[in-house]
Amino acid sequence: MSTSNLSEISKQILIEEETLQFSSFTNEDALQLGLYIVETAKREGKLIAVDIAKNGVQLFHFKMTGTTEENTKWIERKKRVVSLHNHSSYYMQIESEISGVPYHEKYRLDGSEYAAFGGCFPIQIKNVGVIGMITVSGLPPEVDHELVIRAVKNHLNQ
């Protein structure tokens, strides 16, 4: 993919992060988002694992039949990236691709602990900041990201 295309994707992700913010986020919100993601994946015939955490506490976790422990490892690795940067894991993936420097080299991080690949999106409270994250694993990185974005947009538009 060309650098200009990657730059456009990067800008779009920043817009998502800026606009897809919550006024509050409860355990019930986590449940509704998680169920929406699972039902959407089922309807579309996709096998995923999903995790929603707030303030370091897991509020929702579900692994569809056909997913494995490897999906859980990917979730944790993506979550560490969001926790470190307060940006989506897809944004960090694209920024690494633009720079041409692998994420792990740039930040001197262990690749077995951190995964800058799409699928983990920060839960941000307006005028507060990042308080958690929504993570999907099982699909290509951009599709994992898109599934989370669809769920957040749907939830915020209710």
From Swiss-Prot:
Which Pfam families does the record associate with it?
Answer: HbpS-like (PF03928)
Source species, domain of life: Bacteria
Report the family membership.
Answer: Belongs to the UPF0303 family.
Name the PANTHER family for this protein: PTHR28255, UPF0303 PROTEIN YBR137W
Q: What is this protein called?
A: UPF0303 protein BcerKBAB4_3106
Species, as recorded = Bacillus mycoides (strain KBAB4) (Bacillus weihenstephanensis)
